[in-house]
């Protein structure tokens, strides 16, 4: 009987953990178990009896379920300790955390994904107008481009190509129709950039940049009515060519270390003395900089006389400056990896601009980093994933054809296992990353700003671009190594280092941003706990912390129980939204998401602020998160494509690869855990 009760008790408490039951219920169950034990087993083996001892935890749990008592005895000491050890979050870090939204990434962090959050994301589709643009102007400009002439002879696109792009509003796809732009969806922008880039990377980047983070998007979201009226239609029609200057020679794109500054003062503008900003800056690696007519500029704004009423250290601010303005210096052009797209430095010394040249006016002074992060959350989800994905797809198209017609030892090289292996990697990545690109663009179209997903997708697509271009060159051999007008691979291969580096270098994105930021933004309770600990009102902070901490404790117990159960049963009882061929793959995804939630929780709890320094560990957790995301979007793509039976072996191979990669990453985390 005693053994039976022990097993029943463990099962009951396991169920309580699995369903995140409140503490008072735990206490009542413990008291009930103690009473049953005493009735059926008796006082037992000790002077007080085991049954009597079992009442103690039950009573304690019931008492601690009263919020006031729990805060006094348990939460308050923990709250005080957390406040002391919690690293101070800088203003730029806080704004980066506050920017963007969470969606499917939060489901993966929860360990119990709600499948409707994934499957309800609409299928990738273009409107009739967008499809007509793809079939018309996008097709025509591809026919106009001679990539060899562009990158080898001119190191620029011909003037007639530039003119066509401008006149057909390729540079104004994200600008709304109300302001003269095309107002295309994120899906359309991604597909158009992909199409142009597969013909010429230089042309693709030249189209991508004005439709990503820059003056157009910033003015659409934050510009004053006068600024929108003045610039948006001109930007949409190509009468103004924009660039955005953030990166500098000293701090890179780290805004916290930026040395570029502006001081609020009075100065002369158009013959009148007006209140404005005197700027000094030095920027590098600015795409479209050499040909831009309108310069977006990030700088630290200071107001020593508090003329704006915002204090002396106003913060990061964004300005909009015509490049022909007095004092603006456009430096000698860069040649990133010998690519043909325009890129170069710019600088200015004691350049005076009026206050109405600040994007959004004085209302947005000091809010520049938040503005940039909000735009980057969506822009980064569209641009580089499009370039990376289409490069892999193009590599697949030409390499699969080449492997069929190139013969060695009287047989096509494609039938050789040594060639089939890298070719299969290209096949799998082309399918997988097209699915992730399409789903992520659809998220943006639904109004999400997926900051964590955009970061992980940027680094994974561009790393995959590097790997699969290497595979393609290996299969082609000398055919791809010798550059010339008929070499259809070398342009993309040449651009790989650029894609790896821009919009957040992959080393930084993988090891510092993806998991660390994801844990704070997508974890169900962590962000609430940190916000409570930073609350200047200690009473309110303690109350909020108590609520979040109680939820976090239940969440952790559920993860322990759920992970143990699903791993022992190999995911046989995990959830799945379908009974079809993908059922087992959804169940395994649930199983590994549960394990990720458990391990991720312990990593954050144990390391705390040290997670910034344990970058190898953080990078491996980022790999697991990104593998889970790519796995889920692959399953969704198969459903969205109409469940094509011939694609199922590819899907299953992708899933097996993701499982192997996740298990390897887990093993490395465990082997190197501090």
Regions found by a protein language model. Give the residues of each.
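C-terminal amphipathic alpha-helical interaction region
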Residues: 550-674
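A glycine-rich, basic-preceded beta-loop-alpha segment at the flavin cofactor/substrate interface
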Residues: 345-380, 397-414, 559-581, 592-612
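Amphipathic, small/basic residue-rich leader segments at the start of a protein or domain
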Residues: 9-14, 27-29, 33, 37, ...
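Glycine-rich phosphate/cofactor-binding loops in nucleotide/flavin-utilizing enzymes
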Residues: 368, 480-582, 674
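Charged, glycine-rich active-site and insertion segments that engage polyanionic ligands
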Residues: 448-480, 649-659
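Flexible, small-/acidic-enriched active-site or ligand-binding loops
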Residues: 326-352
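Loop-to-helix element that buttresses phosphate recognition and phosphoryl-transfer chemistry
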Residues: 418-445, 470-473, 628-637
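A short core secondary-structure module
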Residues: 272-328
